Structure formats: structure tokens, C-alpha cells
Amino acid sequence: MFFIEFNVKLARSLYLCLNLILSVLYSYITVKFISVYNFPIYFILLITTLIEIFIFLDTSYFRILTSIKTKYFYYILIVFSVVVFILKNNINLYYVLTFYFVYYLLISIVLLNYNLFVIEKSKSIKAGVTDISLYSNLSKLLGFSLGSYIYKVNIDEYLIVFIIVFVLFSSFKINNFKNETEKDSEKLVFNKLKRKYIIINTALLSGAAVFFIPLFIKQLAARNIIQYSSIIFFIPGLTVVLFLILTKKYDINLNRILMFYIIFDILFFILVICEVFLPLQVILLSLIVALGVSISIKLRTNFIKINDKDYRKSIVQIFRISAPVFTIILSFVGLYVENIAYYILLINAISAIHVLYVNLRNREHTLLD
């Protein structure tokens, strides 16, 4: 048993490790579903979003799983991993689905507790939200960068690593008490939330990368240079991480970020329509994604500050589901509307203009408060 004081630094490290596991797992499952079972890529997004919605409902109303101590989730994950390892010779669609569903559900609940702890115990709410976003994007960058090698690794090798990690984490003394972030939040009364439009804005500012990266990949395939596809994934992620590191050191005015976001969004729209130099499109998209994440951090920080602290756990989960839900809705719309990606750019610009308008109109109570 390791006796370690639970602090923000350790919580961030655990958050990074668990998020990295989910990112690697997401890459592995995506490759499996596309290459073996011929499922559309959005099917994985649908599964993860439904899980996140369940966690939100459980956090806000049911309290079935989210009231359980963190250490017990590690025990469950260890037992489940051992069972999955024993049954590894019977891999089929249901095996893979169950494997992903259980892992994503349990790890996401643990991440929610660590997420809330970092926000509560950091020197400021903004610092906590920025740290969470930085570590989340860093883990995705590392996890997705390994995506091209995922199919070469057997599932039992993953399971051995996972079991070792969960045993190690469960042995920490920090998980043997119920910290305050694991407590039940008050049942959410949605009408009591202030500035609910922030939820919509943060959702609308996301999604560009989800739709444009596949389009870029298609362009590479058409030019017979698909081997460079990993760069398309890597550059936006790296840009986000570097920009978040920059914003941790320097406080950049929200209105300036919004104006640059709107300008880049419109410029990117023109370049895409005119099919201008692909590398330039990738760079501009990366900047748009990075600025969008920065805007989202400021909006989420404001929303957490102005609303009841008893709802904080539910609020954190709201922001985990808002963007995926928006993406899924647009994905279904895209089945009937051609060039949906172009409309998303217009939606992004309109959302940013709305936030800028609200911020300029209410100078005494800006979204920076």
C-alpha cells in the first residue's frame, strides 16, 4: 500500500494516464470497427456520447454509479480486465462492444472525480479548467498519434498493461477515503442555471475538426499520399496543446481571441471553397480548433463561477456531452444535407459573433468575470 497525499499535481497525472488509456482504446476500437466490422466511424462517437449522457443523468438525478468510491472502480476494472483476458480467444463484435462500453463508462466516472478535484483545488477555476483541457488534449494527441500502430497490437497485450495500471492506482492510499469531489451533487434544476446559452455556444464552437479532417484524408487518398494522414491528426492536436501552454502563462483577452477566431473561420471557409493549398488549410483549421478550445475554457470557467457550487459536478459533465451531442446531430443532418462541413463553419462564426456581441454589450459583466 502506497501512502501518498492526494493533491492537484497527482490528480492531473492520474487524469492524464486514464485519458491516455481511453484515447488509445478509442483508436483501437475505431480501427477494429472500420477494418473488421465495417461500421461507420460515427458509431463509436454515438456510443461514447450515450455513455456520457448516462453519466450526466446518473450524476444529476439517479446516483447509481457516480456515488461509488473511486477505489472500487479500480477494483471493478481489474476484475473485468482479468475476465476479458480469459475470454480473449472468443473475440467478436459483442466482445469488442462490451469491452469498450465497460472501460469507457467506468474510467469516465473516475475521470469526472479527478476533473472536479482539479477544478476545486487549483489556485483558480480558470487554472483548473485550463489544466483539465490541456491534459485531455495532450492525452488525445499521444493516444491518436499511436493510432497507426494500434492494429498491430494484440488485445491481450493491452489488457496486461491495463491490469498493471489499475492495480497500481488502486494501491494508492489516496483512493481509500471518500474525497469531497466524490460526494453527490445536488439534483440539478436546469431552470436555476444562469447564462444557459454558454452551453450552446461551447457546443457550437466545436465540431469543425471532426468533419474537415476526414475531408482532408480523402484529398490525400486522391493524391496517393495517404501515408501522410497521421500529420492531419497530429498538427491540430499539437497546436491546441501549445496554445493552451501559452494561455497558462499569459492571459489573452477573450474579445481578441473571438475576433481572430471569426477572421480565421471566414478565411478558412474561402480557402476550402476555392480548394487552395491543402497544407495552408490544415494550418488554418489547427488555429481555429486551438482558438475554439481557448474560448470554450473561458466560457466554461465563467459558467462554473456564476452557478451554484452544489451543481458543479453536473455542470462539469454537461460540458463533456454538449459538443458530442451537437456533432451527432450534425452528422445525422449531414446524411440529408450536402457539404454539411461548410455550414458548420458558418455556425461556428455565428456563435463566436454572438459571444463577442454579448461580451461587448455587457461590459460591466463580461464573460471574463
Feature-to-residue mapping (PLM):
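Helix-loop boundary and gating motifs at the non-cytosolic
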Residues: 2-52, 194-232
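Hydrophobic core of transmembrane alpha-helices in multi-pass small-molecule transporters
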Residues: 16, 94-110, 280-296
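Transmembrane alpha-helices of Major Facilitator/SLC transporters
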Residues: 53-60, 231-250
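Intracellular juxtamembrane helix-capping segments at the cytosolic ends
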Residues: 109-122, 293-308
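Glycine/proline-centered helix-kink
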Residues: 137-148, 323-332
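Symmetry-related core transmembrane helices of the 12-TM Major Facilitator Superfamily/SLC fold
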Residues: 157-173, 342-357
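C-terminal transmembrane helical hairpin of 12-TM major facilitator-type secondary transporters
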Residues: 258-296
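A late C-terminal transmembrane helix in Major Facilitator Superfamily
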Residues: 310-336
